[in-house]
From Swiss-Prot:
A Pfam family annotated for this UniProt entry: DUF1907
MF terms (GO), sorted A to Z: hydrolase activity, acting on ester bonds; zinc ion binding
Stretches that traverse the bilayer: none
UniProt entry tagged with the keyword Cell inner membrane: no
Subcellular location: Nucleus; Cytoplasm
Signal peptide: none
Cofactor or coenzyme needed: Zn(2+)
GO annotation terms (biological process): DNA damage response; regulation of DNA repair
Subunit structure: Monomer.
Protein name: Ester hydrolase C11orf54 homolog
Job of this protein: Exhibits ester hydrolase activity on the substrate p-nitrophenyl acetate, in vitro. May regulate DNA damage and repair by regulating HIF1A degradation via chaperone-mediated autophagy (CMA).
Amino acid sequence: MENCSFHVPSLEEICSVLKSGLLKNFADVSVIVTECPDLSKEPFEFPVKGLCGKSRIADVGGVPYLVPKPRLDKVYNVNAVAKKIGLPGAYILGAGATSHKSLGMNAELIFSVQAENESIQAVNKSYVASVNPGDGSCLLEKYRDRNNDNDFGLLSNLYACEGKPGKVIEVSVKRRIGQDNFVSCMRKSLKTHYGEKAVGLGGTFLLKEGKAKLHVMPREYSACPLNTDEDVNGWLKFYEMKAPLICQSVFVSHDPGYDLRLEHTHCFSHHGEGGHYHYDTTPDTVEYLGYFHPAELLYRIDKPSATHMVGRD
């Protein structure tokens, strides 16, 4: 495991940087510092109330453990990760893959879990998005309805904190006028301003209005090696999904040499849809509302020794 400190500007400064970038991509933009809403309430229903306290980002495993061929031996545990990053009992959100050993299939994992510590058991409110074997539609399930463990597999991008209330960055945008998706626009805004000073943000956002393109990995791993982005896209199942979507997002402005996935967002809903977010498909009507917090520390866990850039979108 490797770790380093992020550059952590003030919340007010980050607001200003994000706003300047978002205005090039959305017609209506508001970015302010505010008290984190109670995220234990609808529609989020997290096991904690906030996104604050000892914030950090963990990049675990990586795409090279999925493509060209899956490494099914790569199994990780949320409680172990929380301890490894010095935060037992952490609230963890983000995007990753399920463990084949836990579920007997491949699927998208949408993290929302409070890890265990000496005094509490883990509270896992994560979701699993898989391809319905009956009709090929998306099947969204609560992780706890499938398994009682807290494992995941292959790769994940996680934001961890104490789950406390506190000040966060609220981002509200409507009507997309540029080409970048919501997350890419924010990440690129930070990169343009801070350059090689890595800034990491994690949080949750709502697709309040409109629709978005998402993918879900098939239950069966590819029989043929996935050597190119075209191979990967041919294997994935793509869907257009409707609002409201609750999206768990982790993004980093600059990779300081750790072979990071710079952005990764997975979504769940209360109407049975979820998966890996790509971009909205309804620019004229789209509306996003998000709450984010900068991470203080970066942890790189089980970095693949042989890497590539396939399948990073």
